[in-house]
């Protein structure tokens, strides 16, 4: 059996040795003793050095006495006599807790005579004792390490030859690392703070309150814009963290933070160990300064920040060189002079070195000759001024240009054309391959080219192509005579059309929004173009024959509106039907009501926005050609701000390049595009959390003003379909807060509409858009719905109107109000009319007619009664009546019931002349001109009464021009006759 661990530590009995002696076994020699040093895991592994002969006698004696004291008396005597005792007699009982760790011995300290100032709990006392023990152990361990370092610093001569002398640096670093831990006395600080009196605490609170009031009432920057912000390299401050405190001299704090972020730095709010620099202005926070001094964080001023940007971007050296050198004008001639001067100086230096090598230092006469040969610096400058203009031009210009130099006027015109052109026109694509986002076999460019190249083959009149299915994907457009290119602006629709026409050799005739495109113009001018021949190739001198191949391009078709373009869309559709040439139409909004009728006659090609990477490559190539340095990240920001608009992105880059001192911050302000968002997109941005990351308060408020009438309705309709971020327990509280905000916004809108207080619109934007978006910030869980309030409001208005009409019609026989008619009369009236029709059929028609006659109801009032009494999910009572019975009721009603005064068919349209009908007799009796005037009015009245057009029950044909002329002649003769009679009486 195996022995237990306790058996190794038990003391052996004395009989064991006697037994061995009796058996005659010789005892084995005691092995040499070795020291085992136990090292804790917390301390460094320090190996004790071997014992040396220089040890003091007192220490050896004391150690020997301890060993002898631990052994029995006979063994101690042998040890004193110099004899080695047996191993078995030296063994003593060992407690396992001493080897494997056990309870620590408690030190009993006498109680203090005076009481402590504060009474601590047991945990606080234990912490303080542990920290004191640690401090003492660290202090005691330090001299031991020094001793070890001294012993190790004297190596053996063999090792000294092989090893290189290295100073014991790791020991010193360890000791240094431990020193700050000793200095930190957190419990002492806690004691001091806890010992503070009430007066001191009050003083601290008062001081902090004063500092907070100073912070609230702090002034802005002292001299805004007085210092120029250095233009550093991008990401020159990457990896550095900053904290800005106080009021700077020429910048606001937010402006300084934005400058740091532009160059790749990170801005923090709290001073900590990870902080690299603290930027300080006036009235800086004292706590931040104290913590920065404690952690040895470098403190910078505003000028120090600018110097750091220059230093990190390598501008400091250039600035020093510019200060040393005098100011010179930056002209092309001086640049050439500098280049030539440097070349001549280098050649002079080479000549000097060659002369030194040839002649050496001994030949003084040769040196004097060389010095005399050199001319004065003024003469060299005059000579050099004449040299560069010839040498540089000769190198650049080829021989052909020398023989036939261009005239200065033509050269100037060409340069002016190139320089004055906008970048959009200067760098527009010249071939189909250069169009952005239109590569591949399935692109719209390929489809348009295929359709246009086969147009004359498909429409030659021999065989009519078959109309394709509206949902066909692989339609090549052979049936259509026109093509419709639709898509957002600035993505290359017009460029695609013009380049495809040019590639196939067609001549284009273009009409855009600046031209009048009315029905008359299209009929007179465009219709003649559809059958004409083109002479453009003949006049341009391209050697082409007169061609019949030309294309009509109608740009911005959705803009054909107003009086100028009245009837233009219908005429364009008629021209497409009978056209003998291809027509290419372009529009931005394909869902426009006018375009829906045009789509049925056109080959539909929808253009999508190019991807950001495609536009980025094009713009970076333009920047390289124009020698404009801009970071790719900045280009991506501009493209995203313009909503992937190629034209506007290029215009923004050109605007940035126009200013040489344009910083990246100014570029951010320029790179904005006002987009017209629909209500669905606005609601999505109001509630989506991802959109809120890059939006300020002003941006959130601007969403409301895209359509301030519909925006609150969309928010109210869809806020319950949003799942907000955060804890699910807070969802109901957020919904309640959103409902309160919407109700307050509705009150503000009521005040705006009632009192025309339009200055309250920003307040309504806060309650109706910003607050609901903040409370319910998350993501949509369903589809965005159209506001149901609009439909319900129109339905309630319609029912109120129908109830008012019923109340007016039945007012002769009833005495109730409009509400009583709707609630009490309407169900029973409808039941009395419909029940005989449903039971008896056509025989019940007279009974139904009697009820309608008694209450003076119209035939349309029956439908109004059905609508007022029916509820959602309830069937109409007229559904049980046969259709033939309904028709019989309508016929009998039209025959028997006379038209009421309020019926739609009754009455004749009145004119203002009828108001003077009562005074006609008096006008006839009056003398003189009044008599003539009265006769004139009476004749007009008679004609109005006889005019059948004014009777609503009779549909008369329009009177011809001849009848109007005859009527006019009669009126003229009667008026002249009356005038002659009046003159005769006089």
Swiss-Prot record:
Domain BRCT: 232-322
Segments of skewed composition (Acidic residues): 917-932
Motif (Nuclear localization signal): 955-959
UniProt cross-references to Pfam families, sorted A to Z: AAA (PF00004), AAA_lid_RFC1 (PF25361), BRCT (PF00533), RFC1 (PF08519)
Entry annotated with the keyword Cell division: no
Highest taxon, organism lineage: Eukaryota
Similarity comment: family membership: Belongs to the activator 1 large subunit family.
Protein name (record): Replication factor C subunit 1
Lineage: Eukaryota, Metazoa, Ecdysozoa, Arthropoda, Hexapoda
Gene expressing this chain: Gnf1
